[in-house]
Amino acid sequence: MTKAITLAIFMVVLVLGMVTKETQGEEKQCYDYLLTPQENCEGLICAHECTMQHGGNGVCVDTTSTVCICTYDCTS
């Protein structure tokens, strides 16, 4: 009886975890390319500009490039 209850609880937790994962992935991601004013892209400046403009996460493409890729949740 204890094994059956433990198995049932485990299955409920597993199913709820899968449902939660599916609903979180429904948000559409948008991308924007930001040009940094410096000669080289700096990670902190890229992240700050992306957060201020879109509320997202900014990542430098390359340290020798001036391109910053901003990823954020689309509202529409």
From Swiss-Prot:
Biological-process GO terms, alphabetical: defense response to fungus; killing of cells of another organism
Where is this protein chiefly located? secreted
Q: List the disulfide bonds.
A: C30-C74, C41-C60, C46-C68, C50-C70
Pfam family membership, one: SLR1-BP
Its signal peptide is 1-25
Q: Does the keyword Secreted apply?
A: yes
Its localization reads: Secreted
Keywords per UniProt: Antimicrobial, Disulfide bond, Fungicide, Plant defense, Secreted, Signal
Q: Mind telling me which GO cellular component terms the entry cites?
A: extracellular region
State the InterPro entries in the record. Answer: DEFL (IPR010851)
Q: Record's family?
A: Belongs to the DEFL family.
Q: Read off the PANTHER family from this record.
A: DEFENSIN-LIKE PROTEIN 122-RELATED, DEFENSIN-LIKE PROTEIN 184-RELATED
Name of the featured protein? Defensin-like protein 125
Supply the source organism for this entry.
Answer: Arabidopsis thaliana (Mouse-ear cress)
Q: What is the lineage of its organism?
A: Eukaryota, Viridiplantae, Streptophyta, Embryophyta, Tracheophyta
